Amino acid sequence: MNSGISQVFQRELTCPICLNYFIDPVTIDCGHSFCRPCFYLNWQDIPILTQCFECLKTTQQRNLKTNIRLKKMASRARKASLWLFLSSEEQMCGTHRETKKIFCEVDRSLLCLLCSSSLEHRYHRHCPAEWAAEEHREKLLKKMQSLWEKVCENQRNLNVETTRISHWKDYVNVRLEAIRAEYQKMPAFHHEEEKHNLEMLKKKGKDIFHRLHLSKAKMAHRREILRGTYAELMKMCHKPDVELLQAFGDILHRSESVLLHMPQPLNLELRAGPITGLRDRLNQFRVDITLPHNEANSHIFRRGDLRSICIGCDRQNAPHITATPTSFLAWGAQTFTSGKYYWEVHVGDSWNWAFGVCNKYWKGTNQNGNIHGEEGLFSLGCVKNDIQCSLFTTSPLTLQYVPRPTNHVGLFLDCEARTVSFVDVNQSSPIHTIPNCSFSPPLRPIFCCVHL
């Protein structure tokens, strides 16, 4: 920093972390200011509530806005430093003894006014050096913002894979137990099929576990590359204007290549083999489900012999999709207090649906049309995120890493065992059993379709 600028003025425009003039300064709750890049790099791995670097007061990380006035003052300070530098004897044009205040964008050099009009540079694009430096710095900041969004996206994906790894073995064991439980209800001659299906599921589970670790390693490596590139761009932003102008093009090109080929979370599907005779056994408890006339709508309608319900949003209804998620709920006319019951739902090839049973006190939606909490709701749902569809069950809310069922999905309700089980009818395979359900009879079937 130049001694010609007031020391007090310099101190007020200096980031306490990097000790350079502010670039894109943000002011946090306690009133202290930092460069946004410094704040990001130092607090990314810390929870939302953190401590100020200077006063140690607790502050929020959310909704950081640029301090425009501070940014303008820091820009003026840099311009003053640039002019002092260009006005020095060493920086004068050796040919014309004029100040080199013009920047040539073709050969990235500083020229005096007379040199910029020479035959060599006449047809090149020129601009004032002070203006070019700030414009280039703004381009860097814009690129840094895009890069940081990728840093955060990659970190979210890394967190997803880390969580999956920590829970994967337990999930596989739950799936194995569910299959064993189904075979215990089947005749003894299914023993070889059971053994084969369990061995295949174990092998698939181990393969996926290995792939998860590889995916996590790729994301961790990408995180270091992204953060390193971001720090490099930040360092370039802090360079004196002349150095920034001369080195700008190369670093921008390198940063763009880093944004390519971002690793994504794996699409996990732990497919179990078919269980022979599963549907025949469940059909012993088959019941007819009907909808009260006032609760039927265009998204949930009755099929054929009323032994199954069709659910889903027809793709032809796309013009009716709204920006605000809207849920369409319907309850079955039947109620259950004891016994075992089985029915099927035809979901076709749709997504953003859910169905199951609920306690008598579960209200569905509030006055704003939003779905209430999952307590008292025992359901299977399918949602689409980007290009992937995910299955989940409620009570508790749990992701199910099985292929998305198409056409028919079965529900088996056992009031005495306090369980709700879901079955992929086409694959003759169990999806999940919700154990230890906190039933509060009478129970009612419930169907939901969501337009997103």
UniProtKB/Swiss-Prot annotation:
Zinc finger feature spans (B box-type): 88-129
Record-listed Zn(2+) binding positions: 93, 96, 115, 121
SUPFAM superfamilies named among the record's database cross-references: B-box zinc-binding domain (SSF57845), Concanavalin A-like lectins/glucanases (SSF49899), RING/U-box (SSF57850)
Disulfide bonds: none
Gene Ontology BP terms: innate immune response; regulation of gene expression
Molecular function in Gene Ontology: ubiquitin protein ligase activity; zinc ion binding
Zinc finger (RING-type): 15-56
Domain B30.2/SPRY: 269-452
Key words of the record: Metal-binding, Zinc, Zinc-finger
InterPro entries (alphabetical): B30.2/SPRY, B30.2/SPRY_sf, Butyrophylin_SPRY, ConA-like_dom_sf, SPRY_dom, TRIM/RBCC, Znf_B-box, Znf_RING
Top-level taxon: Eukaryota
Keyword set includes NADP: no
Pfam family, one: SPRY
Any one GO CC term of the record: cytoplasm
Family (UniProt): Belongs to the TRIM/RBCC family.
Protein name: Tripartite motif-containing protein 49D
Organism (species): Homo sapiens
